[in-house]
Amino acid sequence: MVIATYFDQATGELVRPLNETTRRQYVEGAVAYVEAYEPRYIGFGIEINSFKMKSPDEYEEFVGFFRELYPLLKEASPDTKVFTVFQLERIKGLHGGLFGGTNDESLSQWGLLDDFPDADALAFTTYPCLVLKDPSEMPEDYYWEIRSHTSKEVFITESGWFREGPEGWESDDEEQASFIHTLFDLTEDLEPPLLIWSFLYDPDVQIPFDTMGLLDANEAHTRAWEAWTGT
């Protein structure tokens, strides 16, 4: 699986302007790649609904870019499945918690899925710990709700739960492992071909993502690792 993007979804900033020259370079590079390697899956854009919140005009340009690129990729490698990636919590209208807003289903963004009718699949990142304090708060249809809005194949390309959170959002390794069990249970009926935990080891990034690894730098075995691997 390969996922490529030309913007920072957190800031809405482009890596470089999407002018005629860079657009052509992106298209030619992507087509050349799938011709050469025929990947099973290739994605373009990461958390594009978050990108839209920051840069709505550039989001519309991305929608057009995806529509232009899709048939060229399928012509070059017909069996490659082409997709884009959404941020699930924001799609659901969950903007509260560590996002700093409010959880309000009326703010859901499910309609954005319709901007990509050609996509072979739709992918999501999911970090419920940013909006909920315990995995037990996740309703039974937390992931199955996706099926109410698309019949396409569904991928989970990022997932995570932190072991250490800011004040008021404390967690531990037991809670992290509990989320993994919940994630498996609540996605079972979706049968996602891809279900990915974001970090094997704790990354050197901002709180709270810095303790989302299945392992820290000095560990070879944790409750989260046991839950993920079934060992």
Which functions belong to the PLM regions below?
Residues K133-P193:
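Catalytic-core region of carbohydrate-active enzymes that cleave or remodel glycosidic bonds
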Residues E13-F44, E58-E75, N103-D118, A177-L190:
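An active-site-proximal structural segment forming one wall of the substrate-binding cleft
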Residues G12-V15, P166-F179, L186-T231:
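Aromatic-rich peripheral "rim/lid" segments of glycoside hydrolase catalytic domains that contact
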Residues E28-Y59, F83-L88, P193-D202:
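Active-site groove signature of glycoside hydrolases
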Residues M1-E13, I46-S50:
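Aromatic-lined carbohydrate-binding surfaces of glycoside hydrolases
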Residues V15-L18, I48-Y59, K92-H95, F124-S136, ...:
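Surface-exposed cleft-lining segments at the edges of enzyme active sites
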